[in-house]
């Protein structure tokens, strides 16, 4: 009883120091609800002309006076003129931000929206652009503007896979949904149909289609690129992004590691990195069609890269060599030839990652280029090197890039540069890794089960209607999606005093695909972060109980557009209440993919926990709106990353076993089983 009272007191103290994100839900007022409703309606059937007459009237051709109500450089009127006078990408054509002309126009539109002086100007500009610029460009620029404008904080976007399903759902599924809708056109009724997804096993890569084609995974990457577009100039827009480059590295490093664990569960070896001299063996048919009916390019197997209209292969190799030279010399040079140390400057990792991504914070974009994006363009256009077809391939859309197996081979090459840099950093000493007075006594993990399930998805937006009276609800059940049974784990910590600590949880492989046990230094590259959170431990023993739902890397399942709009509309009409959740993050990793697929007889993994000192970085550290999903998505602008250690610590540097194992960490062998849905006994599904 005494122990229970002490534990309750500790829990109460923790709640006071690190408030639960539920405390940050605020009741939305009518002004906010109007904004939220406006945004949802602007995304309604964006691939066709607006059928909502009030927005059409608001969006009539804007006057010079209206376009001057913006602080966009050089002037709103000039930018508006470029977009309005037929110079922009026309509607009905595919859009890709990786194409320079498309990107320039998208930035112009973003500037018009972002620099609008007030919400009224912002909304009118959006209504104007909704029917007058390319629909893909509108979705892209408008989404990013909603994320970054101060007066839109808390406003949420509808799921991208519902707004524009053509980049998320196989075209045969969309075609069948359109056929079903035609049979019931204009009825206004709800129709749900089960449409099986064809994961035909033509190659090894098809074994992983349940993972790479998961709409939540691809929505996660879409939102990440909306938060941190490579063209985003932090100086111009006045937003500081803490650890921007390092976050880019870590996010894609984690995605790759997660992909690797799925390969293990399917008895597949690791992939080889891309080599210029070897053919690209992985064929890929995206099975996607743009809304205008054009098919996304198909890549045959065993093709060699060639020069293309944007770059010569020699140019890309030169940029790559310059980055390697910077790693070897230890310095990167900016546009004024000022050297920046990669090893003796606290921002060294930032300089390198910004150079490799080629974002606008790069020390010298014109000298170091953007080899990450160049790789994608080089292989993406391997079947159309001179853009004769004019269609963007899967590697040049944030919505589709993770579906293509070559992405992971390209990342393997990119990661080689990062590891070359990391391997020159000094290893962590025993004293650096240890936490004096703190020991993880035990970790107890509940049973881990994965399963495949059918899940509902609305394809309302994939059908064309003439007016609001023709709108019918079209739902499909897509099979299959990987999911897991919720699980708990307990971490038993002893401490010589009461103090704030930081807990990080990882999951990694134990054996390779042939059943050989991994050396820790080899498998450190494949540990995926499961959770990261602050905690207050008392003197003596503390048991930390954690549920998989609590994970700070995940985003909850998104409401469908239809459900979301209904909630907002009813609250606007005073029929219900709507709360703005500051702890919600668009960009979080999908909850259904938190753990990799198991096997019927079980797949062995290693559960790893490390407890480190909590070092305060900012006065708002770990307020829920500041840290939810920050490990994969960063903390946004004008916020400090709530940890002083490198991302991925302590697996980010070489490991020497004799010094690595310390009392404040714990390795636990776990088994993940894969069962049929009806064998798992999941509640609430």
Curated annotation (Swiss-Prot):
Pfam families listed in its UniProt record: Hemocyanin_C, Hemocyanin_M, Hemocyanin_N
Record GO terms (molecular function): nutrient reservoir activity
Database matches in InterPro entries: Di-copper_centre_dom_sf (IPR008922), Hemocyanin/hexamerin (IPR013788), Hemocyanin/hexamerin_mid_dom (IPR000896), Hemocyanin_C (IPR005203), Hemocyanin_C_sf (IPR037020), Hemocyanin_N (IPR005204), Hemocyanin_N_sf (IPR036697), Ig_E-set (IPR014756)
GO cellular component, one term: extracellular region
Highest rank taxon of the organism: Eukaryota
Subcellular localization, as worded in the UniProt entry: Secreted, Extracellular space
Keyword set, alphabetical order: Allergen, Glycoprotein, Secreted, Signal, Storage protein
Gene3D superfamilies in alphabetical order: Di-copper center containing domain from catechol oxidase (1.10.1280.10), Hemocyanin, C-terminal domain (2.60.40.1520), Hemocyanin, N-terminal domain (1.20.1370.10)
UniProt-annotated glycosylation sites, renumbered to this chain: 233
N-terminal signal peptide: 1-16
Location, primary (coarse class): secreted
Keyword Ribosomal protein part of the UniProt annotation: no
The family this protein is said to belong to: Belongs to the hemocyanin family.
Function of the protein: Larval storage protein (LSP) which may serve as a store of amino acids for synthesis of adult proteins.
This protein's name: Allergen Cr-PI
Organism: Periplaneta americana
